[in-house]
Structures are given as C-alpha cells and as structure tokens.
C-alpha cells in the first residue's frame, strides 16, 4: 500500500507539473489529486517538496528517455513517435498538459527540478544522436539534428497549448520528417 501511495503521489505530481508547472503545484495539490492522506507527505518524501519534485521529474524524464534509448526505430520514426505522443496527449487533456521536462526546466524552476530535466533531455538527445550516427549521419551534424528535433517539438508543444490546436505540432512533425528524410536519403 505504501508503494501505491508513493507512486500515486509521484504520478499526480507529474500530471500537475505538466498542467500548472512546478512552481504552481503545492503539496496540498498533490495530496488532493492523489487521494493520499496528509501524513503521507513526509513519510514518503522526508526531504519535502524538493524531494518530491526531484523524484517526479526524474521519473518522468526516465520514462521518456528510456523510450528513446530502447527504441529500435530509426531516427525519423523516433522523432515522429515523440511528436505524435504529444499530439495525443494534448488532445486527450484538452491542451492542459504539456511536457513535464519543459515545465521543470523553465519558469525559474529550482535545481531539484531543472537538474533531473537537464539529465533527461541529455539522455533523449544522446539516444537520438546515436540513432542518427548509426544511420550514417556524421558528427556534429547528428547532434545538431537531435537538438533541432527536440527544440522544435518542445516549442511546438507550447504553441499548441497556447493556440489550443495541434496544428503547430503537426506542422513541426511534418517539417522534421522532410528534413530527416533528406539527410537520411
């Protein structure tokens, strides 16, 4: 049961960070969303909000990075799958929930959030760069193309949330597909 409560709190924190950002999410919000009893906060996270934030972002980042690292898709397919995931998520949440890593990295996020987010982005970048080099793209171009894809998709997520439309993300996905196709041809 304790593990279930802890996991529910982490999952709720990630969802709330995606929706509100790290700074605008309180312990009370996480408790309400997870249904966890008030006394469970410091039982599961004795380091307080810093620990909750750090672990939640590390968990979210680890999930995304692991999907990239385990992928047997080529680089173009990896990028397309990443964009399509957020298209579905934006539609599912009525544009309320974006990327938890971005939420942690921006808006004055503290080191307990920004550090794990930076690590996850680095893992994603590394996995995509590796896929590109295995497909014959030389460095430093492979690294640049990975940066372009991650930056473009993250920016398109912001635009899509702002406009309440997946069009920016779809346009970005299509342009990245063309760029990657020309490089990988």
Predicted regions, residues:
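N-terminal intrinsically disordered/low-complexity leader segments
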Residues: 1-3
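Amphipathic alpha-helical interaction segments
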Residues: 8, 81, 85, 100-103, ...
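Helix-turn-helix
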Residues: 8, 12-55
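Amphipathic alpha-helical segments used for helix-helix packing
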Residues: 53, 81, 92-112
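Short, basic, alpha-helical segments at the C-terminal edge of helix-turn-helix-like DNA-binding modules
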Residues: 57-63
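Hydrophobic alpha-helical connector segments
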Residues: 66-97, 146-149
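Amphipathic alpha-helical packing segments from all-alpha helical-bundle domains
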Residues: 69, 80-81, 110-135, 144-147, ...
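Amphipathic C-terminal alpha-helical segment
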Residues: 106-107, 150-167, 180-185
């Amino acid at each position: 049961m304790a593990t279930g409560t802890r996991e529910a709190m982490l999952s709720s924190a990630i969802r709330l960070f995606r929706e509100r950002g790290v700074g605008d999410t309180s312990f009370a919000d996480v408790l309400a969303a997870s249904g966890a009893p008030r006394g469970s906060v410091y039982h599961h996270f004795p380091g307080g909000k810093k620990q909750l934030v750090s672990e939640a972002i590390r968990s979210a980042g680890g999930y995304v990075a692991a999907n990239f690292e385990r992928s047997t898709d080529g680089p173009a397919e990896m990028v397309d799958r990443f964009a399509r995931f957020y298209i579905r998520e934006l539609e599912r949440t009525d544009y309320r929930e974006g990327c938890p890593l971005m939420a942690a990295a921006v808006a004055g996020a503290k080191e307990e959030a920004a550090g794990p987010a930076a690590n996850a982005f680095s893992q994603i970048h590394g996995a995509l760069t590796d896929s590109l080099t295995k497909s014959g793209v030389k460095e430093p171009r492979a690294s640049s193309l990975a940066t372009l894809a991650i930056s473009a998709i993250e920016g398109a997520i912001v635009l899509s949330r702002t406009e309440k439309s997946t069009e920016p993300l779809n346009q970005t996905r299509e342009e990245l597909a063309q760029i990657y196709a020309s490089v990988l041809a």
